[in-house]
Amino acid sequence: MKLIIFTGLVLFAIVSLIEAQAENEKACLPQYQVCTDAPGNCCSDLVCDCYGRYKCGARIGRNCFCLQKGVIYKRED
């Protein structure tokens, strides 16, 4: 009887550990994906870069995207 209880506890511990590891290994966001609500989820070679949106000089929002580190984007007319 003690062996059955011990085996059950060990299996429960293993399942709990597997579930905890699965939560920590969430998929990262690829390049150009929106990261406004999840700034830390971009893949390792990317950074969550945010830009303010303005209309008539007033800020109306913010957009964030996973972009390459060290790359500067400039507006083209």
From Swiss-Prot:
GO molecular function: toxin activity
Intracellular or extracellular location(s): Secreted
Family stated for the protein in its record: Belongs to the neurotoxin 19 (CSTX) family. 08 (U8-Lctx) subfamily.
Disulfide topology: none
Protein name per its UniProtKB record: U8-lycotoxin-Ls1r
Signal sequence region: 1-20
GO cellular component: extracellular region
InterPro entries, alphabetized: Spider_toxin_CSTX_knottin
